[in-house]
A protein has these predicted regions:
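Conserved alpha-helical substructure of the radical SAM core
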Residues: 44-117, 121-140
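Short, positively charged and aromatic/hydrophobic N-terminal segments
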Residues: 29, 34-39
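A short acidic, helix-capping loop that chelates divalent metal ions and anchors anionic groups
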Residues: 84-88, 173-180, 242-246
Length: 278
């Protein structure tokens, strides 16, 4: 994999390290229309095919679907330790509804890849059944998970047709992992990574959010971890989720700084990368 920093340019020290700067993407909101076959937004377009174009002029080919807002972690940069109000379960889209919306996007908007996210998608019961339904649309189906219950699901996900998997992991140190996620689950996540490899969900990708003064001293540890486990590591710049938060170097470890840290230890090779999601 590659280390991506900005438009068209990337660096790598091996085939297993990836650095991502998150850019705004085009979002298509499809409100539930439980009485109709398709979302209202597509009713007048069902007979035609339309490309989705983002603000940078790129054709969007990937659809992200959040299957739940619930999570079994309480990561500090994501949600409070307690007091969360979840969507009522009867307000979540059913698997049938998700499949219908996905079919519209595939058949009429040129989508060829679907990523399932959350919350934590694996807390949604019977998720492999949804993966199977989406895979039958002829698209690549990917999953982003915290990995805590992946040992239980990896093989069934692979059998259902899952193409790719990303596992969020922000520290390789047990005490720090506990502090960041408020859950003592590092061993289960590492075991989940092994389970994904054993199930053939290759290449397995690790998403590591770098935060100054929190885990930026683990950059090289993650790079070595990727090489030793034969998994891709994607270093991701921290982006606050709250609209009022300010992007600043007191929290953020800029991509250039991560690259220099890697460069001090490894030889980096410039390569060119397209605009597709990592």
């Amino acid at each position: 994999m590659v280390v991506v920093i900005r438009k068209g340019t990337a660096w790598k020290y091996s085939s297993l390290t990836d650095l991502v700067r998150v850019e705004p993407r085009f979002h298509l909101s499809l409100a539930p229309e439980r009485l109709g076959l398709y979302p209202k937004v597509t009713m007048d377009l069902a007979a035609e095919k339309h490309d989705l174009i983002d603000p940078y002029g790129r054709v969007v080919r990937d659809l992200r679907i959040s299957v739940t807002d619930r999570c079994n972690f309480r990561c500090q940069y994501c949600m409070p330790a307690e007091g969360m109000t979840w969507l009522p379960r009867n307000e979540l889209l059913t698997f049938e509804e998700i499949e219908r919306y996905a079919r519209v996007c595939v058949e009429h908007f040129g989508i060829d890849g679907i990523r399932l996210t959350g919350g934590e998608p694996l807390v949604r019961a019977h998720l492999p059944k949804l993966v199977e339904r989406l895979a039958l649309l002829g698209v690549n189906v990917a999953l982003t998970t915290n990995g805590a219950t992946l040992r239980l699901h990896a093989q069934s996900l692979a059998d259902a047709g899952l193409s790719r998997i990303n596992i969020s992991l922000d520290s390789l140190q047990r005490d720090r992992f506990l502090e960041l996620t408020r859950r003592d689950e590092l061993d289960r996540v590492l075991d989940g990574i092994d389970a994904a490899i054993e199930a053939g969900l290759a290449p397995v990708k690790i998403n590591a959010v770098m935060m100054r003064g929190v885990n930026d001293d683990e950059i090289l540890d993650f790079a070595r971890f990727g090489r030793e486990r034969n998994v891709f590591v994607r270093f991701i710049e921290f982006m606050p989720l709250e609209a009022g938060d300010v992007w600043n170097d007191k929290v953020v470890v800029p991509a250039d700084e991560i690259i220099e840290t890697l460069r001090a230890e490894f030889d980096l090779e410039p390569i060119v990368r397209g605009s597709e999601p990592a």
